[in-house]
Design a protein with these regions (language model features):
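C-terminal structural segment of proteins
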Residues: 1-219
Length: 219
C-alpha cells in the first residue's frame, strides 16, 4: 500500500463492501445499525445514516500535525488541509474524501511549526500492527515549563471520518500537565459517544488512549 492509499481508503463496513444496498451505496437502510448487526468495529460519533468508520491510521496523525494534502487533476493543483480532506456522511454519504473523479493525491506537506515537537501515536487492534484499528489516537503538543501551550489531538476508528478532539484540546491549553489533567482529557474525549449494540467497549478504550497520549506527550 501507499500513504495516499491509506488516507483515501473507503469506508470499512462489511455490509457496504459486501454489496448490500445501504445508504452509502445509494439505498435506504444502514444494515450495520440494527440489534442483530455485526457492528463491534463501527462508530461512536457523528452517525448520519451510516455508522461505518474511517479505517486509516495515517489520517489522525496528519490532522494532529496540521498537514496539507496536494491534489492534482487536468485543471491544475489544489491544496486541502488534512482535517478538510475527509467528508462526513451528513455532507455527502457517497464518499469519504474530497477527491473527485480524475483527482490524484500527489503529496503531503507537514508544517515546520510542528518539527521536533512532542508527538504521540497509538492504536488498539485485534491483532498486529498491520490490522485495522479499533481505535487510534494521535497527539501533538507544545509544552513549556510543564504548561501545555498548544495541543492538537485526533482519533480514528470512532467516526465516519477522523475526528479532531477540539474540546479536549481546549481543556489542555494553558494547563499544567499531570495525571488529573490527563484523566480529564480522557473523560472529555468520550462526551457525546453513542455506542451501538456491540461496541460499548470502544468508549473506555477511547478514553484510555487519549489519557495515555496526554500523559506520554507531557511526561
Amino acid at each position: 500500500g501507499t500513504l495516499g492509499g491509506n488516507v483515501a481508503q473507503d469506508a470499512r463496513c462489511w455490509y457496504y463492501r459486501g454489496g448490500m444496498p445501504c445508504y452509502r451505496a445509494g439505498g435506504n437502510t444502514c444494515y450495520a445499525d440494527t440489534p442483530t448487526s455485526i457492528n463491534r468495529e463501527h462508530c461512536l460519533f457523528d452517525a448520519d445514516r451510516c455508522v461505518a468508520v474511517s479505517p486509516s491510521d495515517t489520517a489522525p496523525a496528519l490532522i494532529a500535525l496540521d498537514a496539507e494534502l496536494v491534489i492534482r487533476n487536468k485543471q491544475g493543483e489544489r491544496v486541502v488541509g488534512a482535517e478538510d480532506f475527509f467528508v462526513a456522511p451528513k455532507i455527502d454519504i457517497t464518499r469519504m474524501t474530497v477527491l473527485e473523479p480524475g483527482d490524484l493525491l500527489t503529496s503531503i506537506r507537514l508544517p515546520r511549526a510542528w518539527a521536533n515537537r512532542a508527538f504521540y501515536f497509538e492504536k488498539a487492534s485485534d491483532r498486529q500492527a498491520w490490522d485495522f484499528p479499533l481505535v487510534n489516537v494521535a497527539a501533538a503538543m507544545v509544552v513549556q515549563d510543564g504548561t501545555i501551550q498548544q495541543a492538537r489531538i485526533a482519533v480514528g476508528g470512532v467516526a465516519a471520518r477522523p475526528l479532531r478532539l477540539k474540546a479536549v484540546e481546549s481543556s489542555l491549553i494553558g494547563e499544567k500537565a499531570g495525571k488529573d489533567l490527563a484523566d480529564l482529557a480522557g473523560q472529555t474525549a468520550i462526551y457525546g459517544a453513542r455506542a451501538l449494540d456491540h461496541n460499548p467497549y470502544k468508549i473506555p478504550l477511547l478514553a484510555n488512549l487519549v489519557k495515555r497520549s496526554v500523559r506520554s506527550v507531557t511526561g
